[in-house]
Amino acid sequence: MSARKSTTGSKPASTKSRITSKQATRSKAAKHNGKVHTIGSYLVQRLQDYGVTDLFGIPGDFVLQFYVTYCVGGLSLCNSIAGAYAEKSPVIVISGAPGMSERATDPLLHHRVKDFHTQRDVFEKITVATALLDDPMTAFLEIDRCLEACVRFKRPVYLELPRDCVHKQAVIPHVPDDSQPVSDSNALRESLAEAKELIEASKKPVIIAGVEVHRFGLREEVLGFAEKFKIPMCATILGKSVVSESHPLYLGVYEGAMGRSEVQKYVEESDCVILLGTFMTDINLGIYTAHLDPGKCIYATSEKLRISYHHFHDVIFSDFVTALEKQKMKVVTRKIPDNVRPQQLEFKVKPAQPVTTKHLFESINQILTDETVVVTDVGDCLFGAVDLMINTHTKFLSPAYYTSMGFAIPASLGAQVANQNLRPIVLVGDGAFQMTCLELSTALKLGFNPIVIVLNNKGYTTERFLQEGPFNDIPDWKYHNITDLIGGGWGFEVSTEGDLEKAIKAALANKDSLSVINVHLKPTDVSPALTRLADKMSKTL
């Protein structure tokens, strides 16, 4: 193992950010500090009402007093905003834009693409609501509409503010509408009755909790439902850690053949599968190796409610889950076989043994605590992380539906901005690392201390299983030396189990700065989860 420390000068003060999903408190009508609100001041006030304290900016020549530059900045956001839409992450995009007066002669201003509507047209496809804040008669209502949609649907919204409209004052008094949608009472009552009947008639019910349980703040309700009626629980890979994985009712991640066979067997033998907030995606379903009988399923999400083959409309997801917990049903204690629940296996380090992917994840499992959050990228680092045991809820982040490479390092930055008491354990392949590694410079600037573990298997290993070729090879960087480039942090190069043990201990001890561990792996060495999937598909294809 080689290790090196890079140093830098004094660190600037960090910018902290926290966005909560609470309902907004009502702002003071059209007044701001005793003055009439402008479009810009009202937007800032409403962001604060929703708990927003800081903004992430895109570099550029800002065309007004907001963060994202027109087109060159805004369009750079498209891939990440598309991922947020797909995976239901509430994000507010605020973009500056040329002034309305400047547009009158249709000038070819720099940053413009086709016309002055191009950027907004693009974002309409990947957000749940968009608005051009160009009219003080409508801008305040449009701000409220978009922010409410962001919170209600847990998806991105886009606000475009021309630079000559920032200081336009309210024309008429405006008070936010705090009314909330309600469920159809008859549909809610009948859906609960059918769900109760199906659950009570079952001998082996099981819950599969998905990411929407976290997105909509329903973890306590779902856990309370499981505990009240003694129903075992699983999670999807996108919803992994939605509950503590050390909970006695927790079985593991269900994802068809990619998950442990014991979990797959238990779930697929169930006569009542209760899917709550679960995306039925190819990754969540183990590349469609999962087998669930719709006639035996209760399927509830923010967009759909189906009990067996009966569909119910106008039932709000949170209303259904909350009411389900309050139902009166018989309680049956069900024995969970010991081999189904996740177990941490003991292993002994062989110092001279070349490190393997399996051993790497076994080692990572040993260092996870209540103060760590696992952030994993796309590829075998994601599949291997399925078997990690996350002991505290909501301590696992991944793009397991949209699966855009390069997610993990920027996401770890966001995670630590939101909660600096957590230390990110970042799992990233060498290919994904090369896409977004320079965000480590921002982490260093803010004084953050992620531990970045690079699975250096000399290219796109997951793709090699699909089709081998030179297009899967990438430049062989000395990943641990990036700390020299950015001017701070520790770098470690690992080839053996002994190297790995020393590097992890040193990185954990280095609490004041980031660490990058470059783990050399064979190009053909893959995680147990990917091995399980390959084995299953080889028998069925």
Where are these regions (language model features)?
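Phosphate/pyrophosphate-binding active-site segments
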Residues: 15, 21-34, 134-137, 172-173, ...
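Conformationally flexible catalytic loops at phosphate/diphosphate-handling active centers
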Residues: 34-35, 117, 139, 145-201, ...
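N-terminal cofactor/phosphate-binding cores enriched in small/glycine residues
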Residues: 32-79
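Active-site diphosphate/adenylate-binding microenvironment
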Residues: 40-44, 48-50, 61, 66, ...
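Thiamine diphosphate
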Residues: 94, 104-114, 219, 256, ...
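Glycine-rich, acidic loop regions that bind phosphate or pyrophosphate groups
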Residues: 95-141, 161, 239-340, 458, ...
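Glycine-rich, anion-gripping cofactor-binding loops and their flanking helix/strand elements
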Residues: 69-70, 211-300, 391-422, 434-438, ...
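Structural signature of the thiamine diphosphate
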Residues: 20, 53-54, 68, 73-95, ...
